[in-house]
Amino acid sequence: SLGHPQAIHSSPPDSPAMTDIEDLACLAAKFDRSNTRAPTSLQEVVSSGNCMGCGICESIAGPEYIQMKVLPPKQRMRPVFLKALEAEVHGKALAACPGAQVSSLPGWTPTTGMEAFVGKVMSIQRGYASDPETRFKAAAAGGLTTLGMHLIESKQVDFVVHVKACALYSDESTQGSKLSFTSAEVFDGRGSRYGPVAPLKSLEDALSLKRPFAVVAKPCDINAVRNYAKVDPRVDELCKCLMTVSCGTYADNVCVDKFLKQHEVEHSEVEEFRWRGHGCPGDTPYVKAKDGRVAADDYVDFWFYNGKEAGPLTYQWRCKMCSDFLGYQSDVVVMDCWPNGLPERRNAITEERKHEWDGWVLIIARTQRGQDVVDSAKAAGMLTLGPAEGREVLQTQPHQARRAASNFIRRYSHASRPLMALDEGAALRVAKWAMDEDFVDEVMATGPAAPVVADAAEQLREILPKGEAWAEAMLKMPERHIAYHLDNFKGTLKRLERGDATETVSTSAD
């Protein structure tokens, strides 16, 4: 079907077709909550805060119908709807949209919250790009850049679909897909792009070439490609590897404007702009003006203080609700290994510890296809890898575990507002994150405790549905867990009520 894969809300507990998170919660209880629904149009994906700007809708519909643009006031990448789509085309685009449906790799079922958090693993290794220049200049120890270069050099693919990371967002030529046919072109796109970009707006162009290719993009972009494969067989035929990062979110482009203003650099004066790289993590961001002036922030300051006086970093609502941040649908995911679980300021790193910051990553192969790619890159000497364990994901990226444990209750707080649906596998992992007491305890140990509320259980009882087995099971959790879930419910609801999930839909008339 080309129509939108709606979440199912009223299947019996033993139904294999269950797809909504509430159905797959503790004890797989039936939870008929029909006022929870996914967006039913591309426009509603945008208006309800579920869009993340991947560009697949423009790719499917064509630029005469939809164009991805950077739009004020936050300077986010969003579709501009120019003409009405035919029903079949709209259905196809909506079926692919990661703002409408989050999917999973089939045939794998986690048994614990930790397994669900790490995701499907064929192998997990720790290492870096063997080439010193790639390791230094690319982000995250050059892992993804190396894999992309290797796929072309080994002739496993003819080209790679990715983006040019080191670019200022006002450069329109870098706002969409970059198709690289040589390893040098892949290297030219190196570095993280911590801002809105539409890596899939040229996916149809890639498919039309009828040549094997790979995709390097964010987890939500990979989600879109997997969704699209269900309605277009060319994707599985031609796309030989889907590679991604561990994604914490990306900043609105208005944060770049704040950074430039703070350092008294105009857009027109920029000669070079880098989000990351030249160290791990390196300056974040870095700008060189045409007159030779250089400005840079420390990674910690930009992400957590957005340049201190510049104000808080802002990002889109879709990222706050993400349940795919570790690339659970990818063939290969590459993620930073932060020593002690946090990036540190450069001036806090002693000479004795400098080797820890040369750039290390965890590389997880999730599929046999991904395993073959990683193995061949290692055999070719392009990656230097050693053994690692799944628990290192939580130890080096605890912030992602905190996102996981709170995802279920944040989804529940949405009430009647449209929210991207979860397929059965995605729903199961979200339920495992919330309901596995051992996992929640490990997660809570990585951050500050939730505020103590004397009547937390009573408050949560008023919020949850009556008579549902999963809700009763949640209320029987330890008090510290109840306080944790209640705190996340209230925080999400507060943000919803102030309009964080509401956006304006742009048309040709705007």
Give the residues covered by each predicted segment.
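Entry/capping segment at the start of metal-dependent catalytic domains
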Residues: 76-81, 88-92, 96-144
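Long, compositionally biased charged/polar accessory segments in the mid-to-C-terminal portions
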Residues: 157, 268-508
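Non-ligating segments of multi-cofactor redox enzymes
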Residues: 15-42, 83-86, 105-108, 118-121, ...
